[in-house]
């Protein structure tokens, strides 16, 4: 492998990195992946909206379809959903590999390899460590698809603790669960997750994923949830853990996601829904935009990568910003207020509106309407001021 063998090097072989490579129409592309197999380890609940599945190119790996959600606060519950399919549950190992196979028709892969950027006089180069061997490449473009804790973004000075927060996730796969396979279970209880929520996601055939996102030791919090929450205890009373996974989640907004000849995609760019933590929908859209902009650059139709920032911000930037504002309010609410919101919502006409117009991928807009419509005695001047 020579210094100038590739026009584009993508650091990270997850779905977004692979979609970026797939959408580069010209040039030689190398995808560098630190793990020895695509899709391992599991770092996602695998719940993807209908629109998200389309953005991902309708990959293989569906194990269940869901029609809605049971949303629980500490003492209240509301059921959202109707007869229509709202989302799909994926076996991520199968899905990720299917997307990677598509990318492999256009791109080369280097597995069990670690790539990092280094500054040189012409921009940035890539230094790769692969099976003890060090390789230096000088591509025209580098893509940082290296996830929530992106080293690429930090080295560029684009990512820091002020423009994003890193949360931890913990998840079990369990069998022998007694669950309604048509609905996801969401738990808004500060006892178990102070900064996000807890979930039970049915995979079909008595399998579930049980997880939470928060700061600190998520494992102990998840064990506590399973042992103490009355709904979880009933669903999981005969269940056994068959798999354990952890991950990281970036919540924030980057004003700039490129520098010189490097750009960031996916979790590295904070292309994540602030209210649910889902990163595949915005990530896939951003990856496609990145691939198209890189193609223009390689064709010398544009002089720099600024168009990438412009296009993703126009496409979904406002949804991330609004989601962060709603999340700021959400973090101020204790269990008593969450109970009040869920109880009021369960008795309101908004359920019909949500079932008809609700969009998993545009959560901020829906949340704003719901909170403004509910009279819960909080003086929602707070919400007005935030938005």
Swiss-Prot record:
Gene Ontology molecular function: FAD binding; oxidoreductase activity, acting on the CH-CH group of donors, NAD or NADP as acceptor
SUPFAM superfamilies hit by this protein: FAD/NAD(P)-binding domain
InterPro entries for the chain: FAD-bd, FAD/NAD-bd_sf, Geranylgeranyl_Rdtase_fam, Geranylgeranyl_reductase
Source taxon at top rank: Archaea
Disulfide bonds: none
Coiled-coil blocks: none
Entry similarity comment: Belongs to the geranylgeranyl reductase family. ChlP subfamily.
NCBIfam families per record: GG-red-SF
Protein name: Uncharacterized protein MJ1520
